[in-house]
From Swiss-Prot:
This is Pro-Pro endopeptidase. One of its GO terms (cellular component) is extracellular region. The structure of Zmp1 is similar to anthrax lethal factor (LF) metalloprotease domain IV. The S-loop of Zmp1 undergoes large motions upon substrate binding and seems to exhibit a function analogous to that of LF domain III, thus contributing to sequence specificity and substrate binding. An aliphatic-aromatic network and the diverting loop contribute to Pro-Pro specificity. The active site is at E143. Residues 101-103, 117-119 are annotated as: Interacts with substrate peptide. The keyword Hydrolase applies. It is found in: Secreted. One of its GO terms (molecular function) is metal ion binding. The record marks Y178 as: Transition state stabilizer. Monomer. Gene3D superfamilies: Collagenase (Catalytic Domain).
Length: 220
């Protein structure tokens, strides 16, 4: 028996919804809940700063699955938005003149890096996009992914399962001398692709199907 046109549309709709991250079709209530959680995590700078860009960063962070954001909150992690250099902050002053891992030979030091993530997250406002002192698809999602990897998922990027995936797909997102060398960087960048928007999500699914499935299963 041939299915009706309405049934076909319904089946196709279900398939499309199931193939994208939760954030891509989250309702306004879910997004607002994520923003409420972020209001307890994100620390804005004092003084003058680009409030529109800072709010845009928060909006992009709100795409992340709420269970990760809640876990960060429960672990008392703060995402600090900065109006100036990372190393101008007292807590990161010790990084002045230090060359970051993977940046050897670039002539760059932490003074030039717009963000960091792990046990803490710090992000320069206005440096979200690729080419703004970094090669990540999105600064805030990439660095927050490091914190989720380390704090929430117990360094899952170092797990045998992920390393097997990394061995097959770690060079598939470009920047092979960085993403293709460090599993934790490939995890963070893949996470950013997964949650940034529908276009980047689709690119990840096409280029790195095993990584995509890995992230999809983690979010369940």
């Amino acid at each position: 028996m041939r299915p009706s046109k309405k049934l076909l549309i319904a089946i196709i709709s279900i398939f499309l919804i199931s193939s994208v991250p939760v954030s891509a079709h989250a309702d306004s209530t879910t997004i607002q809940q994520n923003k409420d959680t972020l209001s307890q995590i994100v620390v804005f700078p004092t003084g003058n700063y680009d409030k529109n860009e800072a709010n845009a960063m928060v909006n992009r962070l709100a795409n992340i699955d709420g269970k990760y954001l809640n876990a960060l909150k429960q672990n008392n992690l703060k995402i600090k938005l900065l109006s100036g250099k990372l190393t101008d902050e007292k807590e990161y002053a010790y990084l002045k003149g230090v060359v970051p891992k993977g940046w050897e030979g670039t002539g760059k030091t932490w003074d030039d890096v717009p963000g960091l993530g792990g046990s803490t997250v710090a992000l320069r406002i206005g440096f979200s996009n690729k080419g703004k002192g970094h090669d990540a698809i999105n600064l805030e999602l990439h660095e927050t992914a490091h914190a989720i990897d380390h704090i929430v998922l117990n360094d899952i990027s170092k797990s045998a399962q992920f390393k097997q995936i990394f061995a097959k797909e770690g060079r598939s997102l470009g920047n092979v001398n960085y993403l293709g060398v460090y599993p934790e960087e490939f995890f963070a960048e893949s996470f950013a692709y997964y949650y940034l928007n529908q276009d980047t999500n689709s690119k990840l699914k096409s280029a790195c199907p095993q990584t995509y499935s890995f992230l999809q299963n983690l979010a369940k």
